[in-house]
Each structure stands twice: as structure tokens, then as C-alpha cells.
């Protein structure tokens, strides 16, 4: 192959390696850099340009701009995680907003990272809605999940309102449809689960359970776009609301029995490719919900529902479903002592 072709291929590989380093960088440097709130926090953009030797040529544009959105998002998360103990206010956070495409993606991740530190508790409502108004998907995802992490398990009314506006299923009957993207609504569902984590909030759990097998989602996307993310977010959120409930309580009420029966029935339904994407999607989401709801409870009835009926049926279960069910079963039967 020509040298130029090999160099371009190498540049693409090195660029992908650079993009993948962001998550590890955030963990390695967690809370390691001091912050002066009188200045701004610099998040360097991803440098994917390669210089070849000995001719010194520069190779860039190995990836389209759209392919860099999520890597820049994770770059922003990693940068925020490096912040040490500090007190930041709403104006300081909003001052870091950027108008460029890469800058917006980085700042969206920066919001999520600040939320993981708990700093978004201080984000004013006016600034929050100024972030949401442009309907930039990554910014909304970062803000909603960051708020969920900052208000974890508090049931905060203001945070709940921000989540509910993103999800059509949580709007009051007769509301004007907002046509949010499916990814935005998936983030809203998961954010709702974080805000109400381990609160056993029955109404929220009921709304989340209804989205596990929702046939249609009021969205600006094509109906099937990101539907797996939407269903899985609903399952995780439902499990978070009832986190460890089977271990903390006897789950003897009729509502608890009905929920467990519904989830177990959904998990056990699909066998093989002919079962359809929608059924398989619901099964995976239900398994995730069961894993968190019955976390370390030792419930044998739930574990049996998650396991294949016979070893022969292993050949008839999709590999991704088998992975989720095996993981869920292990979490249910984990040491509950």
C-alpha cells in the first residue's frame, strides 16, 4: 500500500485511541486539580492531528465533525471530574458555555461532570432553562443527568420538573406535545430515576413501568431511533426508584406482586430472533429493572425467571439478552448478608 494510505490509516487508529482516553483520564485525575473560582476552567479540545516523519506532513480530518460529538462530551466530563474541592455558583457555571460545535459538546459533558461532583445543586433555575431552550441534545443530556446525580435520592421538586418537561409520558393529559428527541427523553427517564432513587415513589414508578413496553413515543425522531436507549433507561430508572426494595421489604402488597409478575413475564417471553425487536427490547429493560429492584435479595423466584428454563434454550436466546439476564440473576443472588 502507498505510504500515504498507511499514514492515514495509522492516524485514524491513533485518533480513536486518543478519543477513548477521556474516561480513563477523568478517573485517574479525579479531584486532583485546584480551582480558582475567580477564573475560568480550561477544557482543552481533543487534538487528533498527526505529524508524519521524516517528511513532517500533518494529517487531520480523520473523522467527520459529527463523529467527534460524543468524544468531546466525554472530554468535558473528564475535565470536570478533575476539579478538586471548590464552591462554584450558577454564574460561574454558565460563563463556560460555548457556541462552537465542539465547544458545546465539551460543555455538555462539563455539566455532567459538575453534576457528579454535586455542583449543579447551585445552578439557578433561570440558567437551567437557558441551557434547555436551544434543545441541543448533548447539552440537555448532560444537564439532566448532572442534575439527577446532584439531587440523587432527594425527590427535589424543581429537579423533577426539569426531568418531567423532557419526557412526553410525564406531561399532564392534554399538554401540547413538545416533540423532544428520543435520546433527550431517555436522559429524562434516567434522571427521574436518579432524583427518586430508593424513595419507593409509587406514582413515578408506575409511569416508568408504563414506558418499558410503550408502543409509541411522542418524539421528533423516527419511531425506532434510539428506542433501545429509551426502554433501557426506563428499566434502570424503575429499578433505581425501587432500589433494593425486595431486600428492604417483604413486597407483599398486591401492587408489588403485580409489578414483579409483570416484569418476570416480560423477561421470560422472547426466545429466538422471531420474537421481534420490541419484545426483546422490553425483556432487556425488565431484566435491568428486576436486577436493581431485587438487588442482593436472594429471591429465588425472580432468579428462576431470569434463568433459561433448560440448558437447551441457551441456543434460542439472543446473546445480548442472555448477557443482561445473566448479569441480573447474579445481582439478585449476590450475597445478601
Question: Residue spans of the language-model regions?
Answer:
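Alpha-solenoid helical-repeat scaffolds
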Residues: 1-285, 289-337
Amino acid at each position: 500500500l502507498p505510504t500515504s494510505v498507511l499514514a492515514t490509516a495509522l492516524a485514524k487508529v491513533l485518533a480513536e485511541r486518543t478519543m477513548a482516553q477521556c474516561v480513563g483520564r477523568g478517573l485517574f485525575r479525579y479531584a486532583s486539580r485546584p480551582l480558582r473560582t475567580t477564573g475560568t476552567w480550561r477544557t482543552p479540545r481533543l487534538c487528533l492531528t498527526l505529524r508524519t516523519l521524516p517528511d513532517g506532513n500533518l494529517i487531520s480530518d480523520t473523522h467527520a465533525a459529527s463523529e467527534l460529538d460524543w468524544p468531546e462530551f466525554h472530554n468535558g466530563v473528564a475535565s470536570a471530574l478533575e476539579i478538586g474541592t471548590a464552591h462554584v455558583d450558577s454564574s460561574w457555571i454558565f460563563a463556560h458555555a460555548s457556541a462552537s460545535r465542539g465547544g458545546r459538546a465539551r460543555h455538555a459533558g462539563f455539566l455532567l461532570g459538575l453534576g457528579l461532583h454535586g455542583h449543579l445543586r447551585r445552578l439557578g433555575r433561570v440558567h437551567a432553562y437557558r441551557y434547555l431552550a436551544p434543545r441541543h441534545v448533548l447539552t440537555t443530556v448532560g444537564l439532566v443527568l448532572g442534575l439527577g446525580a446532584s439531587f440523587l435520592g432527594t425527590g427535589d421538586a424543581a429537579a423533577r420538573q426539569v426531568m418531567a418537561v423532557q419526557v412526553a409520558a410525564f406531561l399532564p393529559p392534554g399538554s401540547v406535545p413538545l416533540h423532544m428527541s428520543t435520546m433527550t427523553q431517555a436522559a429524562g427517564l434516567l434522571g427521574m430515576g436518579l432524583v427518586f432513587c430508593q424513595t419507593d415513589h409509587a406514582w413515578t414508578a408506575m409511569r416508568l413501568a408504563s414506558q418499558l413496553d410503550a408502543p409509541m413515543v411522542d418524539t421528533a425522531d423516527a419511531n425506532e431511533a434510539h428506542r433501545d436507549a429509551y426502554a433501557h433507561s426506563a428499566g434502570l430508572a424503575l429499578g433505581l426508584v425501587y432500589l433494593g426494595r425486595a431486600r428492604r421489604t417483604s413486597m407483599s402488597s398486591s401492587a408489588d406482586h403485580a409489578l414483579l409478575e409483570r416484569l418476570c413475564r416480560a423477561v421470560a417471553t422472547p426466545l429466538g430472533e422471531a420474537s421481534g425487536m420490541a419484545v426483546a427490547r422490553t425483556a432487556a429493560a425488565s431484566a435491568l429493572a428486576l436486577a436493581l429492584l431485587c438487588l442482593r435479595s436472594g429471591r429465588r423466584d425472580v432468579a428462576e425467571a431470569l434463568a433459561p428454563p433448560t440448558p437447551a434454550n441457551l441456543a434460542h436466546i439472543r446473546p445480548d439478552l442472555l448477557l443482561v439476564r445473566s448479569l441480573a440473576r447474579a445481582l439478585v443472588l449476590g450475597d445478601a448478608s
